[in-house]
Amino acid sequence: MFDILVYLFENYYTPQACPAADVLAKRLAAAGFEHEDIDDALGWLYGLAETTERCVELAHAPATGIRIYTDAEYQQLGTESIGFITFLESAGVLPAPLREIVIDRALASPETPISLSKIKIIALMVLWSQEAEIDNLVLEELLDDEGSRRLH
């Protein structure tokens, strides 16, 4: 599933450039992805859209508080991923509403604890879905595990 998410980032400049889900599924299958992974990725993206709609209200809340993770979140995310999310937030890359979306999408992953490389992909996809400007150094960090990628 995560390979498909990175593929979408690399091949579509914005989420609006992606075709409808059925057409996208056919293109992904033609690119060699497994149908089960395609279904997982499309479901994950649907969840991303739903979470984004719910987090719109958070955009107006003051972002002066400290995020306290529940035990379940801590177990699913792990120390390394929580540290990375905190790093992105303190660097000004990930505002509180987007942080909550990253956490929600990470909790939707079956991996426990989720690896740092997958958290990076999730953060990248959340920023991509919001068409956020991503500094080149941050982009390099988010894509660090996989070697060279095509930059937008």
From Swiss-Prot:
Its domain of life? Bacteria
Coiled coil ranges: none
User: Would you identify the family this protein belongs to, as annotated?
Assistant: Belongs to the Smg family.
This chain belongs to the protein called Protein Smg homolog
